[in-house]
């Protein structure tokens, strides 16, 4: 399988399937597409899969990802769906090594914490 030709950027998303959602990642795996995703740390240092620094575009909520704990973030829905912001661990379990992942680290303070935590998971 040639995984390098097409990459599902933030998963295989559409009008009905939000980017960086577990459904978008499942669909990419079903189509045997490599996946690019972005990770950030929450206030309580959990690794979530989310592209933007702030929550407005995807969740309609004021504030940055780092301003909230994962428990708080998990109550927010992605766009107009029932999908929530996934943990990296949930995405890794969903993908289960079936397709290549390109993980972009969206780092902020504290510098090095995200890198260390992602490295430990791999």
Residues covered by each model-derived region:
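Phosphate-group recognition and catalysis centered on beta-loop-alpha active-site segments
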Residues: 1-122
């Amino acid at each position: 399988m040639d995984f390098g030709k097409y990459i599902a950027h933030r998963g295989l998303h559409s009008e009905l399937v939000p980017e960086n959602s577990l459904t978008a990642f499942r669909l990419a795996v079903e189509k045997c597409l490599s996946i690019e995703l972005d990770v950030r740390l929450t206030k309580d240092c959990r690794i979530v899969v989310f592209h933007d620094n702030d929550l407005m575009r995807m969740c309609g909520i004021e504030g940055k990802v780092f301003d909230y704990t994962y428990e708080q973030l998990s109550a927010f829905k992605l766009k107009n769906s029932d999908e929530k912001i996934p943990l990296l661990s949930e995405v890794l379990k969903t993908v289960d090594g079936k397709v290549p992942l390109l993980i972009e680290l969206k780092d902020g303070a504290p510098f090095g914490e995200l890198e260390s935590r992602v490295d430990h998971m791999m």
